[in-house]
From Swiss-Prot:
Annotated gene: STP1
UniProt miscellaneous comment: Present with 1310 molecules/cell in log phase SD medium.
Job description of the protein: Transcription factor involved in the regulation of gene expression in response to extracellular amino acid levels. Synthesized as latent cytoplasmic precursor, which, upon a signal initiated by the plasma membrane SPS (SSY1-PTR3-SSY5) amino acid sensor system, becomes proteolytically activated and relocates to the nucleus, where it induces the expression of SPS-sensor-regulated genes, including the amino-acid permeases AGP1, BAP2, BAP3 and GNP1. Binding to promoters is facilitated by DAL81.
Domains (record comment): The N-terminal inhibitory domain contains conserved sequence elements important for cytoplasmic retention (Region I) and proteolytic processing (Region II) of the protein. Region I is also required for ASI1/2/3-mediated negative regulation of transcription.
Quaternary state and interactors: Interacts (via Region II) with SSY5; protease component of the SPS-sensor.
Record region (II): 65-97
Protein name per Swiss-Prot or TrEMBL: Transcription factor STP1
């Protein structure tokens, strides 16, 4: 046998791996236990699962107030954002899906399947486009700060934004008071503050106050000695001693005005003015290129670093720098803050026009009535514009005013003056009673209320001479038959009703023209 294997060595070498594989196969089959029968075990497990499903179906039929699992916000992954706990969260889908593009842009799309009640096609048969394709700008520091100095809230109120720290206020007065806090030189300063003393012994951290009430509260709290047991809310009515000079006061209510600002305190430092003058700056309104407004103080103020991300604030600072004289408009203040000096800022502030102009009341004496001079037939004609511009009429001189023309009807004053000569006569009432000679020269005399009279004076009526007689009582009596006839004719009811209707129609047209009505 060995001799035979030597004759065919390659053949026997190839058969060795097969023999080794057969050996290990027999070894494994003898050592490992055979597979058990698990059919009975599977049948029991399936039965328990079916019982669990039946119980779950029964639980689903009964409504529950709280869900079985916690609601987790997976809005960025396509889940729902805010879901009430009493809703079934298993069937809900978000109507908007948000994804992040490789360019770091947030992209939002509307899911058509999640919109309830939406029809896939319109009445025309064209498909509805549900994707918006709206992309927002990349995230930047400017997104965290407001870009406008004023913005309108949902309720219509305007919100004001501080130019120096982006703080928001709903009332402009609060913004004005807040801007004073950014000023380097405060409006009020404690006269007893000493920066050379240690910080623990100072009366205040800086000694400056932007508001007068806090300034007075500081002086009463730190520089007045009160009796023991006096509460802070009762200090104004309490007595006390000045902590600097020792002077006694029965009440501390007017301590600042009567003792400090008046200069009566003997402990005041040298060079201290008797009255602490207010040194707060004024506000200037600046409009940027996009139409927004910014309020800037004229005093030196500190600007927070985060405001530099606001483009409106940077543009407002540029406007201040271009319209100010000096090189120290913007300078470094401290480690990470800037100082804006707008003291020399020049801007043209338009004056506000008053909505309501107060009319000057004219004082009219009851005894004297001012009337123009008498115009005779030979006098030159006076234009109505010259009369209205050169003469100041009193409330009793309404007969000298021109009537208002109407498009639909003529006024009663226009009906009376048909001749050009009647319009140019200005009559002095004193000449009618005192000057008899003038009556004979110029018989065309009109009554003082000629424009208010409701009858038409013809030339024949005015050409009749006036006869005067002297009575025993030294009074002048006038007898004119023609005028008496005209006075009787004006009492005609038909003529009076026509004039009344004409005047009513004129007033109605005037009312409709001014108020836009259609009566």
């Amino acid at each position: 046998m060995p001799s035979t294997t030597l004759l065919f060595p390659q053949k026997h070498i190839r058969a060795i791996p097969g023999k080794i594989y057969a050996f290990f196969r027999e070894l494994v089959s003898g050592v490992i236990i055979s597979k058990p029968d698990l059919s009975h075990h599977y049948s029991c497990e399936n039965a328990t699962k079916e019982e669990g499903k039946d119980a779950a179906d029964e639980e689903k039929t009964t409504t529950s107030l709280f869900p079985e699992s916690n609601n987790i916000d997976r809005s960025l992954n396509g889940g729902c954002s805010v879901i009430p706990c009493s809703m079934d969260v298993s069937d809900l889908n978000t109507p908007i899906s948000i994804t992040l593009s490789p360019e770091n842009r947030i992209k939002s799309e509307v899911n058509a399947k999640s919109l309830l009640g939406s029809r896939p096609e319109q009445d025309t048969g064209a498909p509805i486009k549900m994707s918006t394709g709206v992309t927002s700008s990349p995230l930047s520091p400017s997104g965290s700060t407001p870009e406008h100095s004023t913005k309108v809230l949902n309720n219509g109120e305007e919100e004001f934004i501080c130019h120096y720290c982006d703080a928001t206020f709903r009332i402009r007065g609060y913004l004005t008071r807040h801007i004073k806090k950014h000023a380097i030189e405060k409006a009020y300063h404690c006269p007893f503050f000493n920066s050379a003393t240690p910080p623990d012994l100072r009366c205040h951290n800086s000694g400056g106050f932007s508001r007068r009430d806090t300034y007075k509260t500081h002086l009463k709290a730190r520089h007045v000695l009160y009796p023991k047991g006096v509460k802070p809310q009762d200090r104004n009515k309490s007595s006390g001693h000045c902590a600097q000079c020792g002077e006694y006061f029965s009440t501390i209510e007017n301590f600042v005005e009567n003792h400090i600002e008046s200069g009566d305190c003997k402990a005041l430092p040298q060079g201290y003015t008797k009255k602490n003058e207010k040194r707060s700056g004024k506000l200037r309104k600046i409009k940027t290129s996009n139409g927004h407004s910014r309020f800037i103080s004229t005093s030196q103020s500190v600007v927070e670093p985060k405001v530099l991300f606001n483009k409106d604030a940077v543009e407002a600072m540029t406007i201040v720098a271009n319209n100010s004289s000096g090189n120290d408009i913007i300078s470094k203040y401290g480690n990470n803050k800037l100082m804006l000096n707008s003291e020399n800022f020049k801007v043209d502030i338009p004056k506000r026009k008053r909505k309501y102009i107060k009319k000057k009341q004219q004082q009219v004496s009851g005894s004297t009535v001012t009337t123009p001079e008498v115009a005779t037939q030979n006098n030159q004609e006076v234009a109505p514009d010259e009369i209205s511009s050169a003469t100041i009429f009193s409330p009793f001189d309404t007969h000298l005013l021109e009537p208002v023309p109407s498009s639909s009807s003529e006024s009663s004053a226009e009906v009376m003056f048909h001749g050009k000569q009647m319009k140019n006569f200005l009559i002095d009432i004193n000449s009618f009673t005192n000057q008899q000679q003038q009556a004979q020269d110029n018989p065309s005399f009109l009554p003082l209320d000629i424009e208010q009279s409701s009858y038409d004076l013809s030339e024949d009526a005015m050409s009749y001479p006036i006869i005067s007689t002297q009575s025993n009582r030294d009074c002048t009596q006038y007898d004119n038959t023609k005028i008496s006839q005209i006075l009787q004719s004006q009492l005609n009811p038909e003529y009076l009703s026509e004039n009344h209707m004409r005047e009513t129609q004129q007033y109605l047209n005037f009312y409709n023209d001014n108020f836009g009505s259609q009566f």
